């Protein structure tokens, strides 16, 4: 998608030197064809499964990129009310949006419930109770999954590890069953699944396989 022509770098046949003269520099230039290709690689690999691929807006919240993924049928993984609003603005259906992240505030929880998103990934018992309270106040049901810490050595950079028992994210795997039982007894909570995030910069599926087991 990127190539040199007459010693000038091009992106999808667009001369980036000429583009810089129009928009100024520095600037960001993204190839929609590359985005489409990478998305297709994922969906094709799991075409036999009932799978929803969600683009993580924290990776890049450029509105045009979100719209590109929306046009491909992608869902969205968001970590703030701002990202949630950007996903909705890009016409990603609410039932394809997952709200992850720590420290969700009351306004974010209420907005997510009102917009009937796919699920809220719950980080702690206190957050679960907060979601339940707000859902009851709205007379609505809040779909949730629990972020479970599987105590897995993912193999990435230790400083960005999120899946070991000493890491401060999620609910420990030893407590998970009890918290799921608690959630099942809350009238305004609907359990939709389980959430696991073990880290970044992982280049094999080994750690993911271990966490699933």
Positions of the model-derived regions?
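A charged N-terminal "starter" segment
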Residues: 1-142, 181, 185-191
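Generic structural "secondary-structure junction" signal
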Residues: 11, 29-30, 59, 154, ...
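Short, histidine-centered active-site or binding-site loop motifs used for metal coordination
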Residues: 23, 195-200
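Short beta-strand segments
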Residues: 56, 143-149, 195-197
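Conserved radical SAM core fold
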Residues: 62-65, 83-85, 105-108, 150-165, ...
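Conserved anion-binding
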Residues: 127-183
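Conserved small/polar residues in nucleotide/adenosyl-binding loops
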Residues: 203-210
């Amino acid at each position: 998608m990127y190539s040199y022509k007459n010693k000038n770098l091009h992106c999808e046949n667009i001369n980036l030197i000429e583009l810089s003269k129009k928009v100024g520099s520095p600037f960001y230039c993204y190839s929609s064809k590359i985005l489409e290709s990478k998305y297709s690689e994922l969906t094709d690999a799991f075409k036999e499964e009932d799978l929803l691929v969600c683009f993580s807006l924290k990776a890049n919240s450029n509105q045009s990129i979100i719209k590109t993924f929306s046009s491909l049928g992608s869902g969205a993984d968001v970590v703030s009310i701002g990202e949630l609003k950007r996903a909705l603005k890009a016409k990603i259906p609410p039932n394809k949006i997952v709200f992850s992240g720590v420290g969700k505030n009351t306004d974010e929880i209420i907005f997510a419930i009102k917009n009937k998103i796919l699920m809220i990934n719950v980080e702690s018992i206190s957050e679960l109770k907060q979601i339940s309270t707000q859902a009851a106040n709205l007379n609505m049901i809040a779909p949730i999954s629990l972020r479970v810490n599987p105590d897995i050595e993912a193999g990435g950079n230790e400083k960005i590890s999120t899946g070991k028992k000493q890491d401060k994210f999620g609910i420990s795997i030893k407590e998970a069953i009890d918290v799921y039982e608690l959630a099942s007894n809350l009238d305004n909570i609907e359990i939709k699944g389980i959430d696991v995030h073990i880290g970044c910069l992982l280049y094999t599926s080994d750690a993911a396989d271990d966490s699933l087991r």
